[in-house]
């Protein structure tokens, strides 16, 4: 078993990360690669909970949602996360991982509701828990759901998987002199106006002294290196 720096973590996966190079939907090779990395971390003995977004599915129907009531659109997005959670659960099952999906919206015939004591028991038993439907409320992002669930389950860190390998002093695609921060405090990130998460999620993590690690999900082995405490991505700390 490889060494680990954390016992319990909350992994935030965006729905867009599941698209791979596709315009929307779930790219099969991408989800297989992700589950390989998740399986590696589970094999290290890390208790792993996952919050997943729904942008890859909602993007496909977004043009039809123009002018729609915001709350209605948000509920559609929540249901998209349930579809992603089921797809991820199925892929993890094929890796031999015992996985549970818990939803903030009640769809009892498909997934079980989020019940914190059950979540904690599942994690202690070595099961991977996937949280779906965000917070269950409109106007809150899945980043906020990640911060909330991370605090609720006593995660030691929120791992935010993105398309870039950390937080930079400027947009690295536009500024060749941009440098990656290895570590930065919550207060520094605010002063420098660096976008780590949405404001609500960021404030919740800061208030609960819950550190955030931003790293690239597209970088092979990055998740394992992050959990192992290596210099990967950017750590946002109190």
UniProtKB/Swiss-Prot annotation:
Quaternary data: Homohexamer.
Organism: Bordetella avium (strain 197N)
Pfam families documented for this protein: AA_kinase (PF00696)
Gene that specifies this protein: pyrH
GO molecular function terms noted in the UniProt entry: ATP binding; UMP kinase activity
Keywords carried by this UniProt record: ATP-binding, Cytoplasm, Kinase, Nucleotide-binding, Pyrimidine biosynthesis, Transferase
Gene3D superfamilies membership: Acetylglutamate kinase-like
Name by which UniProt lists this protein: Uridylate kinase
GO biological-process terms attached to the record: 'de novo' CTP biosynthetic process; UDP biosynthetic process
Cited function: Catalyzes the reversible phosphorylation of UMP to UDP.
Entries under PANTHER family matching the protein: URIDYLATE KINASE (PTHR42833), URIDYLATE KINASE PUMPKIN, CHLOROPLASTIC (PTHR42833:SF4)
């Amino acid at each position: 078993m490889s060494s680990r720096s954390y016992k319990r973590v909350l992994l935030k996966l965006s729905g867009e990360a599941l698209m791979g190079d596709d315009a929307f939907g779930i790219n099969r090779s991408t989800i297989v690669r992700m589950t390989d990395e998740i399986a590696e971390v589970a094999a290290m003995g890390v208790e792993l909970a996952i919050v997943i977004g729904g942008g890859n599915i909602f993007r496909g129907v977004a043009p039809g949602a123009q002018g729609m009531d915001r709350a209605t659109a948000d509920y559609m997005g929540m249901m998209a996360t349930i579809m992603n959670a089921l797809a991820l659960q199925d892929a993890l099952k094929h890796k031999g991982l015992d996985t549970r999906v818990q939803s903030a919206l009640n769809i009892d015939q498909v997934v079980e509701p989020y019940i914190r004591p059950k979540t904690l028991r599942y994690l202690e038993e070595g099961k991977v828990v996937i949280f779906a439907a965000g917070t269950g409320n409109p106007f809150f992002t899945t980043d906020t759901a990640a911060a909330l669930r991370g605090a609720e389950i006593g995660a030691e860190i929120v791992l935010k998987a993105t398309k870039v390998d950390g937080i930079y002093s400027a947009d690295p695609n536009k500024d060749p002199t941009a440098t990656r921060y290895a570590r930065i405090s919550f207060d520094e990130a605010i002063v420098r106006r660096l976008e780590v998460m949405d404001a609500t999620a960021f404030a919740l993590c800061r208030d609960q002294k819950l550190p955030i690690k931003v790293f690239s999900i597209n970088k092979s082995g990055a998740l394992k290196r992050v959990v192992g405490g290596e210099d990967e991505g950017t750590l946002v700390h109190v």
